[in-house]
Every structure is written in C-alpha cells, then in structure tokens.
C-alpha cells in the first residue's frame, strides 16, 4: 500500500480574533497534526500582543519559552511551526521599523523557530500599500531569510486575499 498526501502544506493558521488557544491546546494540536500527517502550524493569533500590537517589543521570558517549546515540540512531531508577525496595523515604513522587524525575527529565530510569515491582513491605511509590503518582504528575504541556511522560505498574508470578502471600492 502506498500512502502519501497530495497537498504539500497541510495544517492550520491560528490567526483568529478572540481567546487564543492555551499553550496546552497548541501542544495537543501539534500532537494531532503529527499523528494525522498534517505538517504545518502557522502561529499568528491576533490577540497575541507581541505578534500584532506590540510587535516591536521582545517577548517576555515566560512567553518566549512557550514559543520555543512549541517550535521544538512541532519539530519532534514532524510539523513545521511557522511564527507570524503582523506589523501592518501601525508600521511606519521607515528604516527603524524595518530594522526592528528583522530584529524581532532574529529574536524568535534564537528561540528555535525556523519558519516565518508576515501578515498584512485585517488592516487599513498606510499598511495596505502593496509596493511597501513587497519592498519590506524583499528586505526581510535579503537580510534575514537568506542569512540562515536552516530557515524555510518566507510566507506572507496580503491585505486582500479573498475577493468574496472585499468590496468594489477596494483600491488594492
């Protein structure tokens, strides 16, 4: 019997609003994924302050330890743990914010994470500019992703990713 999946990336994005999953629930999810041939867990809960509203700040030690544990546990279970950052709410598109974003990715890399995403969904204003998003992502690729031989290709979520949820007035 030959048994393999047809879909390369199989898993979930924890990218919703509301009460985030507990650490224990995340570990159970990863365990479930490993047992059922799911290979991807993208961590991006909108209510994780250090993922979104406090994206410029490092994780406090206790929360950093949980991220590290998730990355290690996922690897042990054959699951790619991808940590996402969501800077679009208040990014200023200057060198300081660009450098801060790369420094944040480096800090999460030091926790053992080897897969990263940048989310630009659910925002308005300057953060929605696709040219600026592309320039930032290209910079992250050049100075962070390509620097580390053990990091997977960068993922992203654009501002508008589903036309059925947008209006004809969207200028994106």
Please name every model-derived segment.
Residues 1-104, 110-114:
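Feature activates predominantly on carbohydrate-active enzymes
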Residues 16, 123-172:
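Catalytic-core regions of glycoside hydrolase
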Residues 43-44, 84, 119-121, 157:
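Generic beta-strand/beta-sheet core signal
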Residues 74, 100-117, 121-128, 132, ...:
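Hydrophobic or amphipathic alpha-helical targeting/insertion segments
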